[in-house]
Amino acid sequence: MNDELCISVTDKEKEEKILSVLGLCARSRELIMGVPQICDALGSEKKKGKGKYPLIIFESSDTSPNTHKRISDKCAYYKVKHIRLATDGGTLAQRLGKTSMLAAVAVTNKNLCLLAEKYI
């Protein structure tokens, strides 16, 4: 696995800011939520104007080892930055306005991606 593409965030202040940016992404509909949807989006070809492509992926801390490996392998293969948060899936879902748990979310907007990367 490519180590520079997988980062863990443990600082609470930075994580709060990242969660705020993810909330902004959710409100602007520039977020892909859920591991199957993220893997499908990564597998699809990048075509201009067709679909949304993940630029950075945020994973919750309580994902299973198989899910973590699945996300890590996809990120390494497609060269997408992968961030593991200290937040659990329930808190991540709550902060994004969802009722069920979320294992991972992906930002699809370049400018919002840069804003999130600023706090890593």
Predicted regions and their residues:
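Signal for well-folded cores of large energy- and translation-related assemblies
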Residues: 43-46, 76, 97
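N-terminal first-folded block
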Residues: 14-55
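Feature captures the catalytic cores and cofactor-binding loops of soluble hydro-lyases/lyases
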Residues: 49-53, 63-93
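Short, compositionally biased "basic patch" segments
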Residues: 1-21
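Short basic, glycine-rich beta-strand/loop surfaces that mediate nucleic-acid
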Residues: 78-120
